[in-house]
């Protein structure tokens, strides 16, 4: 297993590539194990987790940094993306019927439990970070759509 600094460095390198070149060719990488809250909720609620590890990918970083989000002020700061693997354990965790959502009150990080993607030309299913965005509605998670996971 990689150290947290190595994971943070890997995320920083991908973000740097995207800022400089508009893309990164880094393959999807593991940022750690699926945490206990998510695992127990999935087991109790028949949610399929494709793996016991959580992945991030350059493609998804590009998605959360796209120009349309930037124009609306919804892009999450690089430092928040870099620190997400460590900080997620202190964040609130929700489930919306399809994805898991981590939030720190200011931003939200969306995790798909069974995401299909190509890795080394082979289609696989992973528990994958799919996007992050700044929160604009502070009451967003108060509705019935979201289940808070303890």
Where are these regions (language model features)?
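Ribonuclease/tRNase effector modules and their secretory precursors
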Residues: 1-150
């Amino acid at each position: 297993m990689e150290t947290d600094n190595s994971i943070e460095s890997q995320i920083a390198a991908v973000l740097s590539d995207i800022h400089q070149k508009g893309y990164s060719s880094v393959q999807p990488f593991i940022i750690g194990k699926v945490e206990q809250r998510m695992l127990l909720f999935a087991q109790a609620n028949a949610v399929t987790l494709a793996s016991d590890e959580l992945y991030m990918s350059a493609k998804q970083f590009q998605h959360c940094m796209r120009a349309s989000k930037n124009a609306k002020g919804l892009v999450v700061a690089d430092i928040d993306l870099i620190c997400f693997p460590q900080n997620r354990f202190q964040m609130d965790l929700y489930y919306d019927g399809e994805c898991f959502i981590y939030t720190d009150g200011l931003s939200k990080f969306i995790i798909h439990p069974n995401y299909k993607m190509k890795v080394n030309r082979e289609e696989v299913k992973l528990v994958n970070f799919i996007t992050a965005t700044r929160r604009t509605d502070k009451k967003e998670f108060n509705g019935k759509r979201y289940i808070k996971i303890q």
